[in-house]
């Protein structure tokens, strides 16, 4: 009898699946990736995630499991926990959350009850689905009230948020965003929370790598709980992370994750998280994070200098920015689709006080973490901005679009993703 273990080559065993995987590898290699929530992991991260740890069930936590044979995964998970604590300067860390959404769900469970009032950033202003969208579990379970940005500056107005907090008296305030290009003042958010006797939770999923490197202010000293993903700017596997300095809350968080929300943790993913945390603890990671900041600022500046486009809030302090494209093309969806055709990948995005449907939007969102991982710098970032503009302005000129495709290929060839 042929054992399943003999089937070690995906290409030979499942050609149909392999072709799809290979096509995705080619897409990543030859497309410029500007989706702000995406990045490129190291081969070491992929190796850990593809290890034999995927075979092991380990309900519970290190030293307190429900199954036997967990002595090895206990070491793995403890490494991930200790590295996360060191990386972010936190007293406690939970590395079991499967995703950022589940990390947020666990934080809510640890802090508040169903039906409680929560003040979170409105999705249209740059917040995330899990910050109270009515179609999400957060909006269905809790009474979320959204805060926005200032209509003139398109930045957070902390005085206005304080007045809103006084009016609605939330049990919890959520800070953090998925499409906000400015630095967030977590100290001011904590002062607002203290003023109304609310908890403060910070979702730093997008900026975690920048925080780890010290190029963005850390929420850890101010928030009761900090949640994050481990991919995006942190450049690890897709997964979640929860941090706190409060021992009592740490116990509630652990109970909320298991058994509250999840069963067995994904120890192969936790191993990959441990690798990513070690990479982020390397001094070179600070250079990488600063390069993200520099590249994003350089790319945004190109749009700011072109009056056919409007840079939301006038600039960026982190890895992302939004651009209103409606002077040159009907909406963000058309812009996204057109740029896909020239092998530049980004996403349509609502802008503050959006007037178009969320399925169309007035803007596009651009992030520079992935191109920075490829080794691209300020010069290449400026070039990419000019290519985007060239394509959008000439969206009905196939000859010019072909020129853009060729220039994109030259760039990706010059900065290969995974060295052959």
Curated annotation (Swiss-Prot):
Instruction: Supply the gene name.
Output: glyA
Q: What PANTHER family does this protein's entry cite? A: SERINE HYDROXYMETHYLTRANSFERASE (PTHR11680), SERINE HYDROXYMETHYLTRANSFERASE 1 (PTHR11680:SF35)
**Catalytic function, reaction form:** (6R)-5,10-methylene-5,6,7,8-tetrahydrofolate + glycine + H2O = (6S)-5,6,7,8-tetrahydrofolate + L-serine
Q: Which UniProt keywords apply?
A: Amino-acid biosynthesis, Cytoplasm, One-carbon metabolism, Pyridoxal phosphate, Transferase
Q: What does this protein do?
A: Catalyzes the reversible interconversion of serine and glycine with tetrahydrofolate (THF) serving as the one-carbon carrier. This reaction serves as the major source of one-carbon groups required for the biosynthesis of purines, thymidylate, methionine, and other important biomolecules. Also exhibits THF-independent aldolase activity toward beta-hydroxyamino acids, producing glycine and aldehydes, via a retro-aldol mechanism.
Task: State the Gene Ontology BP annotations.
Answer: glycine biosynthetic process from serine; tetrahydrofolate interconversion
Q: Which Pfam families match?
A: SHMT
E.C. number: 2.1.2.1
Q: Where does (6S)-5,6,7,8-tetrahydrofolate bind?
A: 123, 127-129, 357-359
Compartment(s) where it occurs, according to its Swiss-Prot or TrEMBL record:
Cytoplasm
Subunit organization: Homodimer.
User: Would you name any one GO CC term?
Assistant: cytosol
NCBIfam families assigned = PRK00011.1
Q: Which cofactors, if any, are listed as required? A: pyridoxal 5'-phosphate
User: Which family, according to UniProt?
Assistant: Belongs to the SHMT family.
**What name has this protein been given in UniProt?**
Serine hydroxymethyltransferase
In alphabetical order, the GO MF annotations are:
glycine hydroxymethyltransferase activity; pyridoxal phosphate binding
From the record, give the cysteines joined by S-S bonds.
Answer: none
Sites marked Plays an important role in substrate specificity: 231
């Amino acid at each position: 009898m042929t054992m399943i273990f003999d089937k070690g080559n995906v290409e030979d065993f499942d050609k149909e699946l392999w072709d799809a995987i290979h096509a995705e590898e080619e897409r990543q290699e030859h497309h410029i990736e500007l989706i702000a929530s995406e990045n490129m992991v190291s081969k070491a991260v992929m190796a850990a995630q593809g290890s034999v740890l995927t075979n092991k069930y380990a309900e519970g936590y290190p030293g307190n499991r429900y199954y036997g044979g967990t002595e090895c995964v206990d070491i793995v998970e403890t490494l991930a926990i200790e590295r996360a604590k060191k990386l972010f300067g936190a007293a406690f860390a939970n590395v079991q959350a499967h995703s950022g959404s589940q990390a947020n769900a666990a934080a809510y469970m640890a802090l508040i009850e169903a039906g409680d009032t929560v003040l979170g950033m409105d999705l249209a202003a740059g917040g995330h689905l899990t910050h109270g969208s009515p179609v999400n579990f957060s909006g269905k379970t809790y009474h979320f009230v959204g805060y926005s940005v200032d209509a003139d500056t398109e930045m957070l107005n902390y005085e206005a948020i304080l007045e809103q907090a006084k009016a609605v008296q939330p049990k919890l305030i959520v800070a953090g965003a998925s499409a906000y290009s400015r630095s967030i003042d977590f100290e001011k958010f904590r002062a607002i929370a203290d003023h109304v006797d609310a908890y403060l939770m910070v979702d730093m999923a997008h900026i975690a790598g920048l925080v780890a490197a010290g190029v963005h202010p850390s929420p850890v000293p101010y928030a009761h709980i900090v949640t994050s993903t481990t991919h995006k700017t942190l450049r690890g596997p897709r997964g979640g992370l929860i941090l706190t300095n409060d021992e009592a809350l740490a116990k509630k968080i652990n109970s909320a994750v298991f058994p509250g929300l999840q069963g067995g943790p994904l120890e192969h993913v936790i191993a990959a998280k441990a690798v990513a945390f070690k990479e982020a603890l390397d001094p070179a990671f600070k250079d990488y994070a600063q390069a993200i900041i520099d590249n994003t600022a350089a790319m945004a500046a190109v749009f700011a200098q072109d009056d056919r486009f409007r840079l939301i809030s006038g600039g960026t302090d982190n890895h992302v920015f939004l651009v209103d494209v409606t002077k040159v093309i009907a909406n963000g969806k058309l812009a996204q689709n057109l740029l896909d055709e020239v092998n530049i990948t980004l996403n349509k995005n609502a802008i503050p006080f959006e007037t178009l449907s969320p399925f169309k939007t007035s803007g596009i969102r651009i992030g520079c973490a992935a191109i920075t991982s490829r080794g691209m710098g300020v010069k290449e970032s400026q070039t990419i901005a000019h290519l985007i503009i060239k394509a959008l302005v000439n969206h009905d000129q196939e000859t010019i679009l072909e020129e853009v495709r060729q220039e994109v290929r030259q760039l990706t060839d010059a900065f290969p993703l995974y060295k052959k």
